[in-house]
């Protein structure tokens, strides 16, 4: 009887721990939604909240127009464990911080360890965005022998033209596989469909109409002297101060 009670208590404790973890992960997802990180889309797997599906759209310089799929893996005890999450791309990407064999992004230079309450997944995704936007800046303070792809670093520093050629190969490969059959049956896996005017046309027109109304509203506000005619720019708090990865930095 005592053994049954002990087992029951252990089961209850495990259930409570799991529920608490699920709420923490949901809170992380809500923060990402609020942050609106341009060109980055993620969603937890339907089957496993520790596995997230993601897509990154390159918008600047070397990786512009690339569509790169990745998986975000959270440690079993996330976020209480100091172990770092992992970002693993589905395809090879030529970048000094991405391993050419495992396709994993090295985040340790920005996050030496995971600090529960201080570090958040939206910051991690912003860092990923930053290393693609400015790869040279992302390795400025990293020793060459600590980089995952020293060849990429060498070309980035000494032969930009060849570096650009290699990244364009990555972009072409990413676009060639954008409509591939999903690698999993998980309903949350992000998929793309080719444009069909009869299906997607009305949605596109609705988006255009909404943008037109938004621009018209902005124009009217500008003509009226800004916010409610009071003048002056709005002030307050932002989630992240430009050039930093700290939450709630004063603008």
From Swiss-Prot:
<dbReference type="InterPro" id="IPR050113">
    <property type="entry name" value="Ub_conjugating_enzyme"/>
</dbReference>
<comment type="similarity">
    <text>Belongs to the ubiquitin-conjugating enzyme family. FTS subfamily.</text>
</comment>
<dbReference type="Pfam" id="PF00179">
    <property type="entry name" value="UQ_con"/>
</dbReference>
<protein>
    <recommendedName>
        <fullName>Protein crossbronx</fullName>
    </recommendedName>
</protein>
<dbReference type="InterPro" id="IPR000608">
    <property type="entry name" value="UBQ-conjugat_E2_core"/>
</dbReference>
<feature type="region of interest" description="Disordered">
    <location>
        <begin position="211"/>
        <end position="251"/>
    </location>
</feature>
<dbReference type="InterPro" id="IPR016135">
    <property type="entry name" value="UBQ-conjugating_enzyme/RWD"/>
</dbReference>
<feature type="compositionally biased region" description="Gly residues">
    <location>
        <begin position="225"/>
        <end position="234"/>
    </location>
</feature>
<feature type="domain" description="UBC core">
    <location>
        <begin position="20"/>
        <end position="176"/>
    </location>
</feature>
